[in-house]
Amino acid sequence: EIKEDLLGKKTGRVIYRDNLTVFQTSGGECRFINFLGMDWHYAVSSQEGVNQYHVWFVPEVAEMLDQDTVYLAAFSLEKQAIKDHSMILHSAYMCYEDTAVLFSAPSETGKSTQAGLWEKYRGTWTVNGDRSLLIREEDGWYANGWPVCGSSEICNNKSYPVRAIVMLSQAKENRISRLKGLEALRKVMEQITINAWNSEFQIQAMDELEILLKEVPVYHLECDISEDAVRCLEDVLAGGRGEE
């Protein structure tokens, strides 16, 4: 009944993704959300006004709200965050010398592994193993905790100024280079939660990313899982520039 009622209010085209159906109503955006490979929806999110949403879940997912894919998609939090100059970055968020170092990469690359190496060899600690909320304040960018953390089970509510974003890739030898311009923009943007179907959102995200990249260095760390990977990044954080 809910689905039929909302579909009756749709305006404009319907956008279909592998796990998401999105369309506009008079109140704003409406989402039908399903798991990949499933043809039934586990949640419906309907925007009724600027800051008002109605969300319905099927009972079977009531215990899954600690999973980011469920939590984030249903509550449309990235849409609210961008209005406050904030973005959600897929990253392992490490506290190092009271600053935030963010390891970012596609899933299964080794973000939490690298953060774990720093804990083991340098005594740092991980704030969140899978997400960070980047907020632009008057004095710069800050990384903040996020309510859920994927499979890492590391989830703390702490805020530190962002020292660096480190894009990871697996390699047999450790080396680091500074990313700039379009390359840095593309790499970071791939790991930001973005509504690809919403042109206004994309423009806002691009504007925020341009500001971020002017203020925060982005590195590409090709690494293994040894202490040498830690040293490689540590040298740059201590004042080195990395390979240009």
Where in this protein do the model-derived segments appear?
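A noncatalytic interaction/capping subdomain that flanks phosphate/NTP-handling catalytic cores
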Residues: 1-102, 107, 117-125, 132-244
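Conserved glycine(s) of the Walker
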Residues: 109-111
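Hydrophobic positions on the alpha1 helix immediately C-terminal to the Walker A/P-loop
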Residues: 114
